[in-house]
Amino acid sequence: MERKLALLLILGMVTLASCGLREKHVQKLVALIPNDQLRSILKAVVHKVAKTQFGCPAYEGYCNDHCNDIERKDGECHGFKCKCAKD
């Protein structure tokens, strides 16, 4: 039962993360889970999924939106990650 719940939570959070929600929004949902090993695993999974930025090659303007949201700079897609402009 616990494995099924964990799998559902992971899949749900991956889905939310891939729908344009930022990591900070999904991590707030993870905070609702009781503090144990499952919570640590979910936090790591959400962080890794958010870090890969799969939307980068698929959606035009994704990196611009991402970099504007985080650093208030322009961004471009580099592989599967966004590169934000330097000063």
Swiss-Prot record:
Gene Ontology CC annotation, any one: extracellular region
Compartment(s) where it occurs, according to its Swiss-Prot or TrEMBL record: Secreted
Domain spans labelled BetaSPN-type CS-alpha/beta: 53-87
InterPro entries: Long_scorpion_toxin_alpha/beta
Keyword line: Disulfide bond, Ion channel impairing toxin, Neurotoxin, Potassium channel impairing toxin, Secreted, Signal, Toxin, Voltage-gated potassium channel impairing toxin
Cysteines paired by S-S bonds: 56-77, 63-82, 67-84
Signal peptide location: 1-19
Expression sites by tissue: Expressed by the venom gland.
Presence of the UniProt keyword Cytoplasm in the record: no
Extra remark: It is not known if the sequenced fragment corresponding to the propeptide is the result of the post-translational maturation process, or if it has a biological activity of its own.
Name this protein carries in UniProt: Potassium channel toxin TsTXK-beta/Cryptide TyPep-16
Organism: Tityus serrulatus
